[in-house]
Swiss-Prot record:
Biological function: This is one of the proteins that bind and probably mediate the attachment of the 5S RNA into the large ribosomal subunit, where it forms part of the central protuberance. In the 70S ribosome it contacts protein S13 of the 30S subunit (bridge B1b), connecting the 2 subunits; this bridge is implicated in subunit movement. May contact the P site tRNA; the 5S rRNA and some of its associated proteins might help stabilize positioning of ribosome-bound tRNAs.
InterPro entries referenced in this protein's UniProt entry, alphabetically: Ribosomal_uL5 (IPR002132), Ribosomal_uL5_arc (IPR022804), Ribosomal_uL5_C (IPR031309), Ribosomal_uL5_dom_sf (IPR022803), Ribosomal_uL5_N (IPR031310)
One GO CC term, this protein: ribonucleoprotein complex
Protein name (database record): Large ribosomal subunit protein uL5
NCBIfam families: PRK04219.1 (NF003258)
Superkingdom, natural source: Archaea
Gene Ontology annotations of biological process type: translation
Family to which the UniProt record says this protein belongs: Belongs to the universal ribosomal protein uL5 family.
PANTHER family named in the record: 60S RIBOSOMAL PROTEIN L11-RELATED
Keyword terms of this UniProt record: Ribonucleoprotein, Ribosomal protein, RNA-binding, rRNA-binding, tRNA-binding
Pfam families named among the record's database cross-references: Ribosomal_L5, Ribosomal_L5_C
Lineage: Archaea, Methanobacteriati, Methanobacteriota, Stenosarchaea group, Methanomicrobia
Record gene name: rpl5
Subunit record text: Part of the 50S ribosomal subunit; contacts the 5S rRNA and probably tRNA. Forms a bridge to the 30S subunit in the 70S ribosome.
Source species: Methanocorpusculum labreanum (strain ATCC 43576 / DSM 4855 / Z)
Gene Ontology molecular function, alphabetical: rRNA binding; structural constituent of ribosome; tRNA binding
Amino acid sequence: MTDMQTPFVAKVVVHMGVGEAGERLVNAENIMADLTKGAKPIRSYARNTLPAFGIRKGQPIGCKATLRGKKAMDFLEMALKTYAVENVLHTRQFDATGNFGFGIEEHTDFPGQAYDPKIGIYGMDIIAVIEKKGTRTARRKIQQKKINSKLHVAREESMKFVTETFGIEVE
């Protein structure tokens, strides 16, 4: 397999949906900054008004952080060890383009995170984007081009990459 055909982790997105603004959102941002080793989380805002949940359009309801490079790999390894107790991911967690995601119900499952009754417990969603070198040519603004089908990451390729790189079985 050539260097252009080898998949890699392009980015990891960590998302925490709180559902309300205020102290809970600030606590979630602090937890995320601590877990991601200093990556500054940005706020996500409600797209629509949902009166049943007391959410107005434009209200901050969550936070997210994007990690790339070595930080992304380190965080993903730590998160997979936390999530996959039996070293298993399911095929339904992978999409058609090779990306995969999973959720962690309690931030206290991460090493070094203790329960604090003043803060509470927060869950998070983690999405890993798997790409091959050369895929940027399809996304860039100037001289955008189509890419060969060999540069697309297939679902099976991504599963094989996760198994070989992180030692996680895919069922």
